[in-house]
């Protein structure tokens, strides 16, 4: 009977009146528009987990949560974060996730001191293996990027874990058409709003591989229109001197993944058989000095520039979408001024009070060993040749969430057991949001970014602004 109930879609959630009776809240790991992720300790077992708290709200679409849960419940792979349990209260949903505490991919590269093609090859091999598993199970991730590739533990030989299934989708007849993904990693067919398939993930892996070998993205331009055209044309280069020490095998591997025609693009299965992955062609020459320098220049980016590019991409996607509708609507979109960054976006290195307060800590419980890398990168993004880097390549813009405690001292709690401030979600000023990426971040963040952009949205005959996030198409 119990097993049958677990399989029943109406009973996959455990009911709770106070989640704090089950878990001790220890640290804020990440925040989003509709959710907060905490480091928690299970009271009965003492095990550590990442708990994603999702506030129930009319502005939040249950289908988005159901999609993420449906995806996570179907998958079990050593390189994919695991959904351990699900709870529900009158005000929240709670996803109990496997704790990923080893840090982000780029941070680990910067900490290494020595870094080779072979190191990059081993990372991509794990990613390909996990994505191949997803594809075999009819799941397309749709938002693969370095920020979603985390190390399981701080140990040197830790596995890479794929996180963030907020945009994942189970294929229907192998073809999808919703425009989503993160610009800079998104495939040409998605940016052009053409029907696409699981091949979009292979393109993203190609972009990630390119960055891992040189430290900057394959597509960058000084204007958003040129950037979009470059991606849709599939035009990129292996520029000197940044690629002089990289093997021809690595370049060949990338070319097969960054193939404009999705029908000709390498699948994960083919990529796993390439000699750069499965053979001995990945060089052991140290490329750390060049790659680490470019990563610091291009990925510790100005939040103002992140917000600008986010707005440009959302505006571009909206125009493409609305062109399919009536002439009057199309004219309204054409006349709409370009979106500008919200004035409250702070600059790199500034104090972000909205993400620093944490739930009540249990001092008797040791935190996972998390490495620290002091960073102070405030320079404007650059790319080879001295040109400015306008491509948004550092992932989805995170939304500052009212779920994060703001007050000093002990937290007040609501009826759900979470902090009372989370009850503000869905109030006046909060708008609907298509999909909320799960943020699994280690407790000590390397850069204190708070990138946000306000996007004009047409609704009910009037236009209002709401927080937008690259990586999520606001038009579905």
Swiss-Prot record:
Which locations, inside or outside the cell, does it occupy?
Answer: Cytoplasm; Golgi apparatus membrane; Cell membrane
Q: What is its EC number?
A: 2.7.11.17
State the InterPro entries in the record: Kinase-like_dom_sf, Prot_kinase_dom, Protein_kinase_ATP_BS, Ser/Thr_kinase_AS
The membrane topology noted for this protein in its Swiss-Prot or TrEMBL record is: Peripheral membrane protein
**UniProt GO BP:** calcium-mediated signaling; signal transduction
Q: Name one GO molecular function term.
A: calcium/calmodulin-dependent protein kinase activity
Annotated region Calmodulin-binding: the residues are: 297-318
Activity regulation annotation text: Activated by Ca(2+)/calmodulin. Binding of calmodulin is thought to result in a conformational change and leads to activation through phosphorylation by CAMKK1.
Which top EC class applies here?
transferase
Task: Give the superkingdom in one word.
Answer: Eukaryota
Q: Which reaction does it catalyse?
A: L-seryl-[protein] + ATP = O-phospho-L-seryl-[protein] + ADP + H(+); L-threonyl-[protein] + ATP = O-phospho-L-threonyl-[protein] + ADP + H(+)
The record describes its post-translational modification as:
Prenylated on Cys-473.
UniProt keyword annotations, A-Z: Allosteric enzyme, ATP-binding, Calmodulin-binding, Cell membrane, Cytoplasm, Golgi apparatus, Kinase, Lipoprotein, Membrane, Nucleotide-binding, Prenylation, Serine/threonine-protein kinase, Transferase
The residues annotated as the active site are 143
Q: Where is this region: Disordered?
A: 326-387
Q: Where is the Protein kinase domain?
A: 23-277
Q: PROSITE patterns annotated for this entry?
A: PROTEIN_KINASE_ATP (PS00107), PROTEIN_KINASE_DOM (PS50011), PROTEIN_KINASE_ST (PS00108)
Biological role:
Calcium/calmodulin-dependent protein kinase belonging to a proposed calcium-triggered signaling cascade. In vitro phosphorylates transcription factor CREB1.
What family is it from?
Belongs to the protein kinase superfamily. CAMK Ser/Thr protein kinase family. CaMK subfamily.
Question: Which protein is depicted?
Answer: Calcium/calmodulin-dependent protein kinase type 1G
Which species does the entry assign this protein to? Rattus norvegicus (Rat)
Q: What is the gene name?
A: Camk1g
